[in-house]
Regions:
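Residue-level signal for inorganic ion chemistry
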Residues: 40, 63, 204, 229, ...
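Metallo-beta-lactamase
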Residues: 47-49, 54-57, 128, 134-228
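Glycine/proline-rich low-complexity segments that form flexible loops, beta-turns, and polyproline
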Residues: 1-4, 18, 113-115, 121, ...
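Active-site HxH/HxHxD metal-binding segment of metal-dependent hydrolases
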Residues: 33, 54-138
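Conserved beta-strand hairpin/beta-sheet module of binuclear metal-dependent hydrolase folds
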Residues: 10-68, 154-166
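Short Pro/Gly-enriched beta-strand edge/turn motifs at strand-loop
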Residues: 17-24, 109-110, 136-140
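C-terminal regulatory/interaction regions
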Residues: 1, 6, 231-286
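Aromatic/hydrophobic pocket-lining residues that form the small-molecule binding cavity
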Residues: 63, 90, 185, 189, ...
């Protein structure tokens, strides 16, 4: 504990063996104030940096401190991975390039949103990579969970799952009506639960130990909200404003814009399943 060169390093929060986290200040959904940037791999071996979402001087300083430590360890950075294209996860790549250079990996949808002149590598469901270390190696497999955002990926390893924006212990996860998919989001949560990981490393907030219960709560909450939206339409409500007010009557302090956006996401899924239809701008039961 009193060592001048502690084994864990001066700028290191180790969530699991071969999984470190640094907090990048970002403009994200309150109450979260930061995005979790994960550094995968053993000290002194191959490393992968996930979601280094820097866009200002504070974020730059945080990432530079970590990369300086990585270099001191004589580690090699294999790649930068972005889990999805939302702005609180993407980086100013010119700033990142001032700190280190490495190929950028991400889904095709994510890579399209990144302004970067260096090497990019599209990754897909089922792809995997190894990070060799002096004492142990770590293997990570890519799975796709696109409900929160098209092209969102998670990384599955023995240590747990780098789970991006699927669930959090701080606040909630939105499924934007603009490009989200509520049905795919719920299916993604069910898939993560079925993998039965012992830990999730989320995009925001603390790590999630024994996450099966939290994932089940998320699934039940979203399915329950979808039923409330459906019941609102059955009751004769036909506009987004009316449907959202009815479906979120149990949370009167909710932001109206957010409740309407989430109600619309649920309605889009109900349109997909054929349970409701839209006629002259009004939602009706099929």
């Amino acid at each position: 504990v009193l060592s001048k060169d502690p084994p864990s390093g001066p700028h290191r929060f180790e969530y699991a063996s071969g999984v470190e986290c640094i907090l990048i200040p970002t403009t994200t959904l309150p109450p979260a104030t930061h995005t979790n940037c994960f550094v995968l791999g053993e000290r002194g071996g191959m490393r992968a940096i996930v979601d280094p979402a820097i866009k200002d001087e504070d974020g730059f300083d945080e990432l530079k401190k970590k990369v300086d430590e990585i270099r001191k360890d004589k580690s090699e950075i294999l790649c930068t991975i972005f889990t999805h294209r939302h702005q609180d996860h993407l980086a100013d790549m010119e700033m990142v390039s001032q700190i280190y250079e490495a190929p950028v990996w991400g889904s095709p949808e994510t890579l399209e949103a990144i302004a970067y002149n260096g090497e990019t590598v599209p990754i897909h469901e089922g792809d995997s990579f190894n990070l060799d270390g002096p004492k142990f190696d770590t293997k990570w497999e890519v799975i796709e969970t696109p409900g929160h955002c098209p092209g969102q990926i998670c990384l599955v390893g023995e240590q747990g799952i780098v789970s991006a924006d699927n669930c959090t212990m701080v606040g909630s996860i939105l499924v934007p009506s603009s490009d989200g998919d509520m049905g795919a989001y719920i299916s993604g949560l069910e898939r993560l639960r079925d993998i039965n990981p012992h830990t999730l490393f989320p995009g925001h907030g603390p790590l999630i130990p024994n996450p099966k219960r939290l994932l089940s709560e998320y699934i039940n909450h979203r399915k329950g909200r979808q039923m409330k939206v459906l019941e609102a339409v059955k009751s004769g409500h036909s506009s987004i404003q009316q449907i959202a007010k009815s479906a979120y009557s149990d949370t009167p302090d909710v932001n109206p814009a957010l409740s309407q956006d989430q109600a619309l996401s649920h309605l889009k899924d109900l349109l997909r399943t054929g349970e409701v239809f839209l006629l002259s701008g009004k939602y009706q039961i099929s």
